[in-house]
């Protein structure tokens, strides 16, 4: 009887599999996970840039690339004088998809936002630094500079490039 119990216990222990260990949310990822993520984003960015370029060629408005990887309707846009940190700005913008369908009925606006202290889309914050009071520009923004891989958890899905019509008030 002891032999049967011993053999049963031994066979049970030998069947145990090592479950993969997943890092906690916000935890540290392995180098392989980081490489996979980096390659995915690089490939997605390449595809989106080509799609945006194709869209631009079908438009009668000229768009110009910026150093941060978005396009604007102003030539030499990011060569202008840059607004400094701590300066304030009031602005509004509307979001569109590339079918030119407005995503939200109401404009998103902020009054007296301070550079370096407000949470905004990377492309919007960067563009605002180069805009003049009363100026309006249109931005073509890849998803990595918009709402990225998670979307806005409302109307904007993950990995969606956007058209942003931005105005300094």
Predicted regions span which residues?
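Sec-dependent bacterial lipoprotein signal peptides
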Residues: 1-16
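Cross-family detector of peptidyl-prolyl cis-trans isomerase
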Residues: 15-169
């Amino acid at each position: 009887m002891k032999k049967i119990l011993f053999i049963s216990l031994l066979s049970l222990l030998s069947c145990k599999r090592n479950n993969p260990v997943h890092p906690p949310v916000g935890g540290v990822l392995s180098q392989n996970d980081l490489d996979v993520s980096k390659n995915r984003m690089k490939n997605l960015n390449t595809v989106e840039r080509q799609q945006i370029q194709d869209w631009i060629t079908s438009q009668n408005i000229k768009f110009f690339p910026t150093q941060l990887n978005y396009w604007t309707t102003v030539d030499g846009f990011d060569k202008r004088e840059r607004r400094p940190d701590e300066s304030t700005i009031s602005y509004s913008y509307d979001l569109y998809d590339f079918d030119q369908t407005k995503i939200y009925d109401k404009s998103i606006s902020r009054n007296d936002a301070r550079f370096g202290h407000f949470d905004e889309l990377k492309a919007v914050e960067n563009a605002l630094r180069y805009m003049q009071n009363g100026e309006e520009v249109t931005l073509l923004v890849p998803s990595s500079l918009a709402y990225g891989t998670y979307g806005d958890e409302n109307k904007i899905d993950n990995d969606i490039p956007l058209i942003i019509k931005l105005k300094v008030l």
